[in-house]
Amino acid sequence: MIEKIVKESEKGILIDIEVTTNAKKNEIGKINEWRKRIEIRIKEQPIEGKANKAIMKFLKGIFKSEILINSGTTSAQKTVLIPDKTKDDIVKILKKEIKSI
């Protein structure tokens, strides 16, 4: 399932995520198999881009790479871009981080 969520593109690796804001802590949750997205919980509220900034900072810490929001800047369903990692690198990191694997 994780291989369907992590995709290669010309610009880098794309990951489909679903964001829950106002969480107790920043964390990667489980895979939402119905939506084919990884659940990300963020403490910040979606006000004036604070949640998007928190998502990028949180994921940058996990992937040790630049993170860009490719689509969904105003939606809970987003696609993030990681320009300088391979799909294999990302899948390995996610398998360690995701709670349902």
Curated annotation (Swiss-Prot):
NCBIfam families reported in the protein's UniProt record: DUF167 family protein
Pfam families attached to this UniProt entry: DUF167
Family: Belongs to the UPF0235 family.
Highest taxon listed in the record's lineage: Archaea
Name of this chain's protein: UPF0235 protein MmarC5_0538
Gene Ontology cellular component terms for the protein in this record: cytoplasm
